[in-house]
Amino acid sequence: MTQTLLAIEDLSVGFRHQQTVRTVVNDVSLQIEAGETLALVGESGSGKSVTALSILRLLPSPPVEYLSGDIRFRGESLLHASDQTLRGVRGNKIAMIFQEPMVSLNPLHILEKQLYEVLSLHRGMRREAARGEILNCLDRVGIRQAAKRLTDYPHQLSGGERQRVMIAMALLTRPELLIADEPTTALDVSVQAQILQLLRELQGELNMGMLFITHNLSIVRKLAHRVAVMQNGRCVEQNNAATLFASPTHPYTQKLLNSEPSGDPVPLPEPASTLLDVEQLQVAFPIRKGILKRIVDHNVVVKNISFTLRAGETLGLVGESGSGKSTTGLALLRLINSQGSIIFDGQPLQNLNRRQLLPIRHRIQVVFQDPNSSLNPRLNVLQIIEEGLRVHQPTLSAAQREQQVIAVMHEVGLDPETRHRYPAEFSGGQRQRIAIARALILKPSLIILDEPTSSLDKTVQAQILTLLKSLQQKHQLAYLFISHDLHVVRALCHQVIVLRQGEVVEQGPCARVFATPQQEYTRQLLALS
């Protein structure tokens, strides 16, 4: 008989706010056998991540309260275990890959130090032996030139590369159970396939159980033995994968299986004036070596990109992780140094200093890929959204700022009554709406959207896309939309640029590029999507 590795029994979890407790997980029961993959799917805010984080008691208490039920690992309770017992389980026997990479990676340390720490603590390895293991694991998860990247800091990696490092960090301990919370979210389809194959191989080698949380149903089809569907904190359907996909019984499961980004970009305003003109943009990061960290070379990550973006238009930047998409966005924001010409609404930006840029900043806003990193956990939603107003409109009173926050929360589909809550109390999709509200409140002309829907399930993704389209039409916003999801790009973008290793592979109207791609790499991306 197969041994039950993990059993979640009638679990209910709540968040306390003053005198009230809001139940976010309600009477959930799941079990995972050794060598089995259970996929946990459901929309943002359904309780998937709270359920997963409860397994290792990683949620802060207070405000979290475990209202009823238990979680058992190999028959032993984890909810009622001592801190010492939990320390022996965390990382060693149960490893976790988090949804937001920067939660797991220390921004102050190079990758080698962080990965070595895992092997030193959990497997007692010495540095030389550990280095070989680290390089092998980084290579297996698809980090190019792994030996050269060991001295990089997390901020020098793309979002997808950070997720791959995080996966490597979890797998180095060779755990009995792996909890994977959206582990392939930021990865392009080709690397996603590599990661799934790697997880399958390691599962076979270690007889490892896996709780795989995702909104990507195509991954669930390829990887999961069984599937549990969550809605509003409850498990509404649970079955083996083949049966659930062939004949789902619950209406919500049927809705999930039928959801996919669709529709066309909003009509362009006529006439549409040029808002952003970029010529020969290039970004290079210095390579430093030696005790004195002297610059010995440069790593060119964006190579001579040129494009124009009109008011009310969306330009999609697509390509695999590490192709230079996010770096291009940071260069346009003047958050990193670059060469070339950036002209915004007739004003050259390249030679402006910080003081000269300030009057323009409110007109170019950004929504980052990772809302958990971009939202200050110590500020409540009101403080987060009004922060830009304090800088750019300092004469507004507190009451005026609050009224603007309430209005913009309505506009992005958030309940203004939640404005005194903190980011940790919101789901990933709700946090992304907060980030959009923070950008929108300054009435920008251009918003740079860096994978804004990549961490969201399909139903919430569709809601965010509808929101972005409606905001674009209402305010004549221009979007630079950075994504690896070609379905989303097709539904939102007028123009598209395909990047590979910092270079433009193909560029043109979205409809033409999707219908008749000229380059083999573009055809490969479309075939895998």
Model-derived features: positions:
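ABC ATPase NBD coupling module
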Residues: V64, L78-A95, L121, A242-P248, ...
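Conserved ABC transporter NBD signature motif
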Residues: Y66-S77, G340-L349, I360
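Conserved ABC ATPase "signature" region
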Residues: A129-K148, A399-E417
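Conserved ABC ATPase signature
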Residues: D152-L157, E161, Y422-F426, Q430
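A short, proline-enriched helix->beta-strand linker immediately N-terminal to the Walker B motif
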Residues: L172-E176, I441-S445
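A short, surface-exposed alpha-helical micro-motif characterized by mixed small hydrophobic
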Residues: V220-K222, V489-A491
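ABC ATPase "signature
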Residues: C235-N239, S247, V504-G508
